[in-house]
Curated annotation (Swiss-Prot):
It is a multi-pass membrane protein. The chain crosses the membrane at residues 4-24, 34-54, 55-75, 98-118, 128-148, 195-215, 225-245. GO terms for cellular component: plasma membrane. Belongs to the UPF0014 family. Pfam families: UPF0014. InterPro entries: UPF0014_fam (IPR005226). It is found in: Cell membrane. It comes from Synechocystis sp. (strain ATCC 27184 / PCC 6803 / Kazusa). The keyword Transport does not apply. The lineage of its organism: Bacteria, Bacillati, Cyanobacteriota, Cyanophyceae, Synechococcales. This is UPF0014 membrane protein slr1647. Keywords: Cell membrane, Membrane, Transmembrane, Transmembrane helix.
Amino acid sequence: MEHALIELDWADIGWMLGLLGAAIALLQWQGLNLTGQLLWAGGRTILQLIVVGYFLAVVFSLDNPWAVLLVLAIMLTIAAVVARNRINPRSKSLFGWLWLSLGASTAISLGYALVVIIQPPQWYSPQYLIPLTGMILGQTMNSASLAGERLASAIQQNPREIETHLCLGATPGQAIASYRRAAIRASLIPTVNQMMVVGLVSLPGMLTGQVLAGGDPLNASVYQILIMFLILLTNTLSTIAVTATVYRQYFNQHQQLLV
């Protein structure tokens, strides 16, 4: 039997603060002075999600492709900035390449899902495009950041080995190939682990959201399968593209290592 989603109001948000207060009190009891940090994080959580809620309500009411694309562009830009800051905040050119890499990988996987599987009445339907992009982009941002940071660290820590390969005639791509494969493999471990335990240990956002909204649990499970495979493909594409971009930051036009 399906029931409508129980709506929460501002008074309920006040009660939610009790959860934050309990966490702060427990940490203070353990001698961890994280009160300011947690209050700041909690305040940002409330403010950001309330603003996003109102903003998305406006976008949904407009039903305009340009409004939807603006939202996606903002999400992509923030993801690229966060990934750049994790990998190499001093690089000026890395942001643009990350923006293209994350955007292209997300567009490829989402395009397949929308055209072949979901087939919404309008390609820009915000009901599907915005939440799907948000779930996928958040995951691929983390995977790309992990792969890029791991590869950058490996190059910085092993300059002699890389230069030895270069002296023996290897190209930059060949010289760092083992580090790149290790970085891609490490970045995909969380995704694979999540796929192994989904439905057993954790109930992901798409599934729980539809069930809470009164949707059919089986249909929600099918949508979650789609999300998991979309995340896998997008993470794979983005880590391949990002690592290819990152290692080129460490070589000049003469194929010399810059570390």
